[in-house]
Amino acid sequence: MFTGSIVALVTPMDDKGNVDRASLRKLVDYHVASGTSAIVAVGTTGESATLSHDEHVNVVLQTLELADGRIPVIAGAGANATAEAIALTECFNHCGVVGCLSVTPYYNKPTQEGLYQHFRAIASCTDLPQILYNVPSRTGCDMLPETVARLAQINNIIAIKEATGNLSRVGQIQDLVNDDRFILLSGDDASALDFMCLGGKGVISVTANVAARQMAEMCRLTLAGDVHAARRLNQSLMPLHRDLFIEANPIPVKWATKVLGLIATDTLRLPLTPLSASARPAVERALQHAGVL
């Protein structure tokens, strides 16, 4: 369940900004049918930063209910305050999620020791598997491989989503952790194939929101060693990997998901605003290039 194509799911909203359950059901069904390995509910792509605590928990629980055991659900549970990250994680202790994804604290820029203490405190409040999430381009904080290796010694810290796009991190973390049970997941669609070739086990993917079957197949081929076929498939996805970040995630992917009819609106919570008209043709061309539109 912690391998292959794991979708970082968008959170569908109606015109008033409330969670759209009908669209959420359609999304879950789409990923079940497309072979997605698991769903991350309310991560960065799910607009965790603009949902209240209660909304955050509710979206995860709704996703679980709609999944109904057909696909594993991972709860986004990160926060830049350790106490809030613990409070979120504790909400998911006995609800049925298979694990939690917890991002490095953003804005307050902790030291490496602060990062270690933060994640150790979260892990101590739960028996759920914990996936670390390192995305310095968004958080302003880079968790170094040495810190990852320290955290990997904690029993229920079982994986990292590495979203630096720096492929040398794969080998650095593997060498320092020296434990094949610790799972490395790419957090960067564009380099995910090469990440897996170096020993990663999958990707937590934005692209999978709109090209779920293709991402699942690309991961399957890569992990099976058929890299030539995987690269051929991935070439059709490269414009999506690029243009789904033409504006800040999840702005483009939410518009693309609406264009495909998977959600009813591309409503986002302020300060995020819908995809600008000038950026839409590039995303539309990328969808066409991938063969999904």
Curated annotation (Swiss-Prot):
UniProt-recorded Gene Ontology molecular function terms: 4-hydroxy-tetrahydrodipicolinate synthase activity
Pfam families xref list: DHDPS
GO annotations of cellular component type: cytosol
Keywords for this protein: Amino-acid biosynthesis, Cytoplasm, Diaminopimelate biosynthesis, Lyase, Lysine biosynthesis, Schiff base
Name of the top EC class for this enzyme: lyase
Sites annotated Part of a proton relay during catalysis: T44, Y107
GO BP: diaminopimelate biosynthetic process; lysine biosynthetic process via diaminopimelate
Its EC number(s): 4.3.3.7
Family annotation (PROSITE patterns): DHDPS_1 (PS00665), DHDPS_2 (PS00666)
Catalytic-site annotation from UniProt: Y133, K161
Listed pathway(s): Amino-acid biosynthesis; L-lysine biosynthesis via DAP pathway; (S)-tetrahydrodipicolinate from L-aspartate: step 3/4
InterPro entries documented for this protein: Aldolase_TIM, DapA, DapA-like, Schiff_base-form_aldolases_AS, Schiff_base-form_aldolases_CS
Keyword Protein biosynthesis: no
Reactions this protein catalyses: L-aspartate 4-semialdehyde + pyruvate = (2S,4S)-4-hydroxy-2,3,4,5-tetrahydrodipicolinate + H2O + H(+)
Record: residues binding pyruvate: T45, I204
Subcellular location: Cytoplasm
Keyword Transmembrane annotated: no
Its biological purpose: Catalyzes the condensation of (S)-aspartate-beta-semialdehyde [(S)-ASA] and pyruvate to 4-hydroxy-tetrahydrodipicolinate (HTPA).
Family: Belongs to the DapA family.
Subunit relationships: Homotetramer; dimer of dimers.
Name recorded for this polypeptide: 4-hydroxy-tetrahydrodipicolinate synthase
